[in-house]
């Protein structure tokens, strides 16, 4: 018996026949799948779709990890720096001194500070009421009176702030 599937290749249609040659020898398959109707094909797809979907979903984090270990460590280091230098004014992405200058995407875009480079520049040199934290920040009145941050630390902060803004400021553990 031979099943004819419209648009199916000879290989595909051979999968669903009751007799098939194996390695050039006329050998009968012990448990052939016989499809007589489109209903049988629909039934087969309905039975196979849920387990195949589950397998694909289970394997997808392995094949496509959301971020690398290095990015995770940088985010944690950025969170630690943020908690040390920025959280006094910008707790959970807000701004207790100037409410329209939060670290949420909408305000960052409106204020022209929506890229890592711009966040770095504002963190280094300051802007408006925000003091600069860079080692070479000038003029003196625009810069923090507290400890200055190294370039790499400001880069980590800029990456962290951009990442958090893109995520809507979820809680990040610094452990």
Curated annotation (Swiss-Prot):
Binding site for heme c: 86, 89-90, 130
Protein name in UniProt: Cytochrome c6, chloroplastic
Molecular function, one GO term: electron transfer activity
Positions annotated to bind heme: 98-102
Self-association state and partner proteins as the record states: Monomer. Interacts in vitro with LTO1.
UniProt cross-references to PANTHER family, sorted A to Z: CYTOCHROME C6, CHLOROPLASTIC
Localization per record: Plastid, Chloroplast thylakoid lumen
Function text: Functions as an electron carrier between membrane-bound cytochrome b6-f and photosystem I in oxygenic photosynthesis.
Gene Ontology cellular-component annotations: chloroplast thylakoid lumen
Other comments on record: Cyt c6 and plastocyanin are functionally equivalent.
Post-translational modifications: Binds 1 heme c group covalently per subunit.
Organism: Arabidopsis thaliana
Family matches, as PROSITE patterns: CYTC
